[in-house]
Amino acid sequence: MLSKIRWLGVVIALDLILLLGIGVQAVSYSESGVTCDIGTEGLPPLLADLLAVPQSVADDASRLATGLFGDCQEKCDYFVNQLLAIYSEAKDKDFVMIFNPGGWGWDFVETSPGWWSIFNGIESELESSGYTSLMLNHRRAVDSFLGRLDEAREMITGYKSKAMDLASRIEFLTTHIPDLKVILAGESTGAIITDSVMKILADNQQVYSIQTGPPFWHQNNILDRTLVLTDNGIVPDSFSRGDFWTIIWDNLKALFGFSQPVDGFGTILNYVEAPGHDYWWQYSEVCFEITNFLRQNFALK
């Protein structure tokens, strides 16, 4: 009997040590975001010609990196290279649009069907008014166990560190490209970090945001220069409204084969169906609201 108790104690102790180790690793783990071109599968942009970047711009990028990552030279270099490459791509553009995905934060706009249609719609509207634009992804997490833990921790704290990272990138662009307009796009949980960035950059009149389907527990801090959609005009967004009964009922029907899930239509963290939690340019209400927002803020034709 005593040996069994000792064995049980050993098992419990090992479990506690394992959980403690995971907890310590999760707390210390922090993944740097990647702002990248569409279609590159998350690879950071490459700086074609460093000599074409003014020295003052390069120095400011280094200063920002040190402020964010301290003496971690690898992270600093990674951050600086991204900043300067994006600066080089954006310096002759009128608009930069940055997509913040929902789910766990590692999806791309080209694999998010609803927002891909919206991106194309916005780009077309800007182009028809004679504006040039650069469309980017911002991947804030990696697809791994620690990546999930890090994302969950950030989500709970309102993306305190990840929002500062992204806000620094945007502030850098708008400082060194004075006529540039930046539109932040946030889908579902990505709307939380988008709102947090807008709060940090509340006084930056060059930055705007479009958010769709923010979670029901999140209350937007900043509404100036911001469009928040919680209804696609077809079905009320059950996730934004916290309509748990609709979510549960819809998933039960799918579980027992009474309905078939449709790829790209309303899921939470890539797994749970949420009726109405999808936004497409083809939806007349979505198209109208976004087009109206663009025309009011940017005097589109």
PLM features: what roles do these ranges have?
Residues 1-6:
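Positively charged n-region of N-terminal signal peptides that target proteins for export
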Residues 125-127, 161-163, 211-213, 236-241, ...:
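Short, surface-exposed, polar/charged, turn-prone segments marking secondary-structure boundaries
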Residues 10-23:
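Hydrophobic membrane-insertion alpha-helices, especially the h-region
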Residues 15-17, 27, 31-46, 86, ...:
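N-terminal charge/polar-biased segments
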Residues 78-84:
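N-terminal post-signal-peptidase region of extra-cytosolic proteins
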Residues 221-301:
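Lipolytic serine-hydrolase domain surface
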Residues 26, 163-236:
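Serine-dependent carboxylesterase/thioesterase catalytic core
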Residues 29-73, 84-180, 258-280:
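Active-site catalytic motif of lipid deacylating hydrolases and related acyltransferases
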